[in-house]
């Protein structure tokens, strides 16, 4: 199987996000890379499901709470930017202050 660098990056995000999801279900708090991967994954999947950029940006601040991440993580992630494939092409989605 031959994957482009972008495809490899997306697979890495998905792998880290699945780990983050498992940890959330067990009640564990996410660290910085896990939180970024989880948020990125939700954007990518939301775009794939047909949500708009505006919908994802509005919902993005509801996906993780401060009590779901380790101390200091919200301050380390003032925004998350992820390119996602929408029905009308690839677009950049920015989540501002995604952990509240």
Swiss-Prot record:
This is Urease subunit gamma. Belongs to the urease gamma subunit family. The gene is ureA. Pathway: Nitrogen metabolism; urea degradation; CO(2) and NH(3) from urea (urease route): step 1/1. One of its GO terms (biological process) is urea catabolic process. Heterotrimer of UreA (gamma), UreB (beta) and UreC (alpha) subunits. Three heterotrimers associate to form the active enzyme. Pfam families: Urease_gamma (PF00547). One of its GO terms (cellular component) is cytoplasm. PANTHER family: UREASE (PTHR33569:SF1). It catalyses: urea + 2 H2O + H(+) = hydrogencarbonate + 2 NH4(+). Its main location: cytoplasm. Transmembrane segments: none annotated. Its EC number is 3.5.1.5. SUPFAM superfamilies: Urease, gamma-subunit.
């Amino acid at each position: 199987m031959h994957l482009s660098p972008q495809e490899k990056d997306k697979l890495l995000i998905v792998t880290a996000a699945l780990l983050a999801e498992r940890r959330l279900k067990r009640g564990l708090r996410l660290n910085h890379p896990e939180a970024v991967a989880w948020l990125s994954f939700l954007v990518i999947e939301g775009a794939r499901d047909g949500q708009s950029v505006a919908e994802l940006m509005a919902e993005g601040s509801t996906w993780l709470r401060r009590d779901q991440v380790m101390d200091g993580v919200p301050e380390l992630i003032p925004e998350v930017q992820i390119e996602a494939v929408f029905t009308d092409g690839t677009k950049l989605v920015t989540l501002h202050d995604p952990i509240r």
